[in-house]
Amino acid sequence: VEAPVEEYEPPLIVRGKTDGANCFACPFSAMGKPKQPVTGEGPERPIWIIVGEGPGQNETIQGRPFVGQSGRMVTDALVKIRTRRESVWITNATLCQPPSGSTDLQKREARRCCAPRLQKELSEFPGRPVAALGAIAAQGFCGEKFSITQMAGAMHEVDFDGTGSRVVIPSTHPAAILRGGTGGGGGAHTSDLGYWSLCYDLQKVNLIARGVDIRFTDDIEYETSDPVRAEKLVEDMVRDIRAKREFACDTETYVDDPKQHSALQAAHAKLNAIGLATTERAISVAWGILTQRAKRLIGAVLADSGIIKWFHNGLYDVPVLNRHGFTVEGPREDTLLMHHSAFPGLPHDLQRVTTQFHAITPWKAEYRHGQGSLEELLPYNARDTLATMRDAAPLTIAVKRSNAEKTYEVDKAMARAAAIMHVKGVPIDRAVNEELRVGFKTHIDRTRAELHGKVFDEGIHSRFKERLAFEQSRRARKHDPLDMDERINKRLDEMENPRKPFKFMIDSGDHIVAFLKACGVPLSIQTASGRVSTKKDILESFAHYPEVRALLTYRENAKLLNTFVERLFTRQYGDKIVYGFADEDDRVHPRWSVHKITGRWGSEAPGSQNWPKADKKKGRPNLRSQVIARPGRALVAFDAKQLEARIIALLSADPFLLDIFNNDKDIHSEFARIVWPDFDTRPVDERKVLRDMIKRPEYGAFYGGAV
């Protein structure tokens, strides 16, 4: 929807005041007074209001809000939605620029101190809608628990200043967009997507301010207990569907076994409720009360090849419907995949998709999936279904404008294949799985014993304890001495306590840091909390130390054992039962995702798109050996070899890339020869490592990341 072009008369721009701020308690003030305050500005009668988080350096120098890079983005967005900056009141949640290194806690405290000033300022413009840019600003209107990554774009009605309710729509701050943000999620070239989202959100505020009715009306009905009324709701809805020739369908499911990880698996899920919607209204009915006639009515429209069916994630809903006796025929559309095709870097959950296009209040917060009664579940289901149907039109336009029709068709085809793969599952050989488990445990125990023996080596143990005492002393305990040396001595005394014999804990960050430093590894990079980091990418730069190599091998094998071996089958550890992914037929049913930003597939529960290969040096067997084919079947593997590089070679017509593929060369080895001219003279094992290393900058360049 486009706003009408306004008749332009240059307005008189007025400035806000600093009155009301509690500067004495503000962490950004100077001696109880605002430090270079930047007040709001705009016309005496603004159409609507923009509230940012706080002024930056350019704003402080010029004394005006939003005049730096963020301001230029806001101004560009206003031009895009055909609104003049001079017609909008622009201000910030805080008056003063946050000092360098300010924490979110300090920013929130400054916002609270400035809130009386902002309330007084906005009370001059009662009822005017607000675009709140950034989490700090949005939390001032929507509460401290508000998450900008989850709720950006949603409409809230708030009485902020005592003058009555006004519409507030939070959006991602332009500064976050300039850093590559999208308001949730990330990936290549996401700043463009973030800018589009900002424009959508500002346009919604703009249209509401001008009286255009774009609010999402909640036209829903539901039935939890009366079979007669439920059948009547279905009958009336089916009549509307046959007239409209399209509808949306959504399912709510549950799992009646203790395998909680299966709650979102179509292969195990059972129907709890089903929702149907046209663009005008939606219904939701409890599955347990549906009559056979009502089920036949639903089944008839699902099987009608002349009616368009809309789903948000049909990869899940369609297999669930199939398991309950329904056949889905004819055109099938998917709003999740459409959104992925048009906006690949944005979050694709239904609420975020809907709030991008509609002025709608959040409804997901009212019901947590899998919890609550039918009285809570069915309204949630009906809103989901109605949102799916109403998202169809704007998403169809977005896909067309993005020239993403073919991408969407490919995604739909892949989703159907992924749904079949999920339901069918993958057979796992229980005997081979047990062999892998024993082999992994043996190697892990051996590596742990080697590291443990090294810790208690005569030349290292004393240094290790001193380092460990220092690391542990950096975090004070209750009743600890203030003096650091005394605190270290206290920790050393605790280690010598005969009642509590000292144990080396290989999974403790402090123990690992102390051990590696005692071995001479110069670790120094710290986490945000001030601890020395032992992340994989940091340790890999010290892999020439044998202790580091042993630790990395231990961690990798422990992770693989848990993820690809032990989690596949249900196991009992003492009194505790850990349920595995495999069903009663020894099949696992991975959940496949075809809407990753790169276009590659992903899977979970368990991750199955890339079973790790054998590595004798790391003591790692071939984990795919436990995946088997049943008698009379064959196990087939496909690999789109270096597909991204081949596409780039074709699109760019780069002579270097074309020569590689036309002459059947290995692109990774060719790039490795450029970086390491002596690549071909190095040992085979070393060449394998270098070839793997070069893949990171290659794929970083392919997907728009840092090189």
Language-model segment annotations:
Residues C142-G153, V168, P174-L178, L271, ...:
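Metal-dependent phosphoesterase core characteristic of DEDDh/y 3'-5' exonuclease domains
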Residues L207-V285, F357, W363, G370-G619, ...:
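Conserved "right-hand" nucleotidyltransferase catalytic core of DNA-directed polymerases
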Residues R72, A135, F146, H156, ...:
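Catalytic phosphate/metal-binding cores of nucleic-acid and nucleotide-processing enzymes, i.e., regions
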Residues I49-V51, F247-D250, F311, R332-E333, ...:
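Short hydrophobic beta-strand that contains or immediately precedes a catalytic carboxylate
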Residues E2-A209:
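A polyanion-binding, active-site-adjacent surface
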